Amino acid sequence: MSDSFTVSLRPIREKRDRPDSLPREIAQINAQWGSFRELSEAKLREMIEEDKHKDHWEEDDEGDKESTDLETSEQLDQLYKRRAEIIQYALQAHMEASFALDFVSLLLSKHQPRQAETSMSPFLKSAAPLGSLNSEVVNPPPRPDSTLKDIKSVARGWRLQNFNSAADKLLNAGSRLETEVNSETKYWNEVLAVKEKGWKICRLPRESQALGVQYGFLEATPIFRDRGLAALRRTDDGSLFLDKGLIPLKSQGVRVRVRRGDRIVGCSKVCRPPQDAESIESRILQARDTVFEEELFYEVMREARILGTQGVKTRQNLVQVPVSDEQEILLDLVDWDQDRDPDAADSTEQDVFADAVAHSIRILLTYAHRQNLRRRTQPPPPLAPKRRPVPEYHILRPIMAYLQHKSHIQWLESLINDLRGVLQSAGIPCDFKATQFSSIGTLQPSNQVPKVEAVAGVFLAPFLSTFSGNLVTPQSSFRIQIRTNLAVPPFGTFYELSVNLPQYPDVQPPNHVGLQDEVSAILTHVIMLDIAAAIPLQCRDTADKEAKERVSWDVDYPHHGELHFLSRNGQSRKMKISLSRQELTIETYQLNRMRGVTPGAATSPTLWQTWRADSPETRPTLSEFVAQASQP
């Protein structure tokens, strides 16, 4: 341990960022070495030589030994004294700075009282009023005339320069004000012109300082109702600019095409923008039409999704609506310059049909808007915890119902005309009457519902058409009603058949029939029954002598169209009646046995006759054929 030595650890001396200022260095030299008067060159050389031979480590060790000799209590007393001195100096400096600040503030309060009051102490505010201290120059030194002349020249120059600057600023402000007035006048004139044409001008909800024009429909879907308001901006020259926001630049519309098989046979016209597209009214009309068309296609797509069971198909930008087995309607949203399909064939009739469908869907959307307005003006329903769903508009369903009903009418009318032609070719008089769309009657005037809404409301109700006619025998008739409904279940088209057959009062067809083949089979079967009942009546009503010698036919199997007669000598004959849409066939058979024979025992007819509607040959009538077959 005797070999150990003590090493003092000192902090690393860092260089100062900024050197001490010259006055501070002079003050340090005076405090350490005294005044400069006591320094000489010889004394400085001696101090330099002493510093060269001096051991700095030894000096530090002596200082450490002296410091270790001091007691701990003395060090604390010395520390407290130094701290008290520092605090006293700081308080004194703060007090002197406060006095100086109060003095300057009181002096400035004569000229700028409000600004000076903010820097005064509370004691000074209560002790001295504002502006009580002022300063002025006492006995200023005289200035020469040249200096006064220069000051006046400089002051005059500054005033002239300020006057010129003020004049330039006033002229610029005047020209700018004139330009602004002209721009504002032009802007407000165009705004008034828009208002005079019937458009609603209002403030924007989120920009209270901006005006907007309401061109949309207030009863539309909230998504499109909010888009029906555009800002009326002003350009630099004062022209009115319509800020359409999310509305596309090109005008768009719903296009309706008719496809038959794989060919497009008809296409509707999309509304084109006005020729004067630069005017503000044309832009408003274009924006209104575009928003209306977008809402129309949105509602069509929304309704088409719930009509999947009716055969309606949807794609990304296409709706396919079936009309018949070979024809369907295509709806899509396109730009105004794409309204014509390049693959479409030239067909004026189908183009008119496509335009009619396009106008119909627009009318139905407008009718839905009016219904929304009517519901909104009525008292609200009771509150419910669940939010009421927004029902889909009836746009596609009325059109589908009308086209489907019309297709069934054409089919039934064609069937009845074919049967009438066959019967008339056989000399059977018949009369048919058709009342198409009997549900669309004359409108009753009403003060509550406008006539336009009443007309549109009729097409939303189920469609009803009636076909009636007389059959062969007296008092025999039939009646067919076609009912089509796509709004409420049951959906589709149904036939309601009723017949009046005095010879067969118990025969009644099914009440609701949905298939056309069944309707065709029922109607031909009823007519065949009536023909079978008319043949025996015709034989009995013949009053001449030749007719008395004829045989009388009896109906054996009416639903099979079979009649027979049995003569006195035991001869038996059978008559077979077959009726279809294309022809009427009657055959007679000679039977060798008595009446107990089963139907169809004979293999080849003895007499037969077929009547067709389009047959150019002259054929005997049904009465003549029955008379010939009744000969003994």
Curated annotation (Swiss-Prot):
Q: Which GO terms describe its molecular function?
A: transcription coregulator activity
Q: Where is the composition biased (Basic and acidic residues)?
A: 11-21
Q: Which GO terms describe its cellular component?
A: core mediator complex; mediator complex
Question: InterPro entries, alphabetically?
Answer: Mediator_Med17 (IPR019313)
Which parts of the sequence are annotated with region: Disordered?
1-21, 50-72
| Domain of life, source organism | Eukaryota
- Keyword annotations of the record: Activator, Nucleus, Transcription, Transcription regulation
Bias (Acidic residues): 58-72
Gene Ontology BP annotations: regulation of transcription by RNA polymerase II
Question: Cellular location of this protein?
Answer: Nucleus
Xref: PANTHER family: MEDIATOR OF RNA POLYMERASE II TRANSCRIPTION SUBUNIT 17
Protein family: Belongs to the Mediator complex subunit 17 family.
Protein's job: Component of the Mediator complex, a coactivator involved in the regulated transcription of nearly all RNA polymerase II-dependent genes. Mediator functions as a bridge to convey information from gene-specific regulatory proteins to the basal RNA polymerase II transcription machinery. Mediator is recruited to promoters by direct interactions with regulatory proteins and serves as a scaffold for the assembly of a functional preinitiation complex with RNA polymerase II and the general transcription factors.
- What is its quaternary makeup? Component of the Mediator complex.
Name of this protein: Mediator of RNA polymerase II transcription subunit 17
State the species of origin.
Emericella nidulans (strain FGSC A4 / ATCC 38163 / CBS 112.46 / NRRL 194 / M139) (Aspergillus nidulans)
Upper classification of the source organism reads: Eukaryota, Fungi, Dikarya, Ascomycota, Pezizomycotina
